[in-house]
Amino acid sequence: MSELPTVSIYTDGACSGNPGPGGWGAILRFGDKEKELKGGEPHTTNNRMELMAAISALEALKKSCQVELYTDSQYVRQGITGWIHGWKRNGWKTADKKPVKNAELWQRLDAALKPHKVNWHWVKGHAGHAENERADQLARDGVAMARLQKNVRG
């Protein structure tokens, strides 16, 4: 069996108000190739945008990869490496029997992981990590796009 290609992914989410207009950004790096992704929604939360950054990056991969995914969101990292196992066992309910917030995004992230081997890394946000800073800028661009979308819709 051949070795999987290694891709580094850097993600971030942002929200102006929580809830409010939000954006997400991701950088995918494979060797010397790099791709930037961004998007936004007019009414969302920071946690949803953090999830969308990871989902969108993983869904953009065209074949199975070894992924090193860097996020400044403890919510995403802890959720996908720990909490999700209990949620799935409990029918997408928390330990106190409440519905999991953002369950549809967690399910989408779980599905996006399936073809890949992913190592999750937490990086401190706004601490000078170049790729995290760039992902943050892409996320803020996504917020601006979402604001425009909101204003156009009225």
Swiss-Prot record:
Its cofactor is Mg(2+). One of its GO terms (molecular function) is nucleic acid binding. It catalyses: Endonucleolytic cleavage to 5'-phosphomonoester. GO terms for biological process: DNA replication, removal of RNA primer. Keywords: Cytoplasm, Endonuclease, Hydrolase, Magnesium, Metal-binding, Nuclease. Binds 1 Mg(2+) ion per subunit. May bind a second metal ion at a regulatory site, or after substrate binding. The keyword ATP-binding does not apply. GO terms for cellular component: cytoplasm. Mg(2+) 1 binds at D12, E50, D72. It is found in: Cytoplasm. Mg(2+) 2 binds at D12, D136. Monomer. Belongs to the RNase H family. This is Ribonuclease H. It comes from Bradyrhizobium sp. (strain BTAi1 / ATCC BAA-1182). The gene is rnhA.
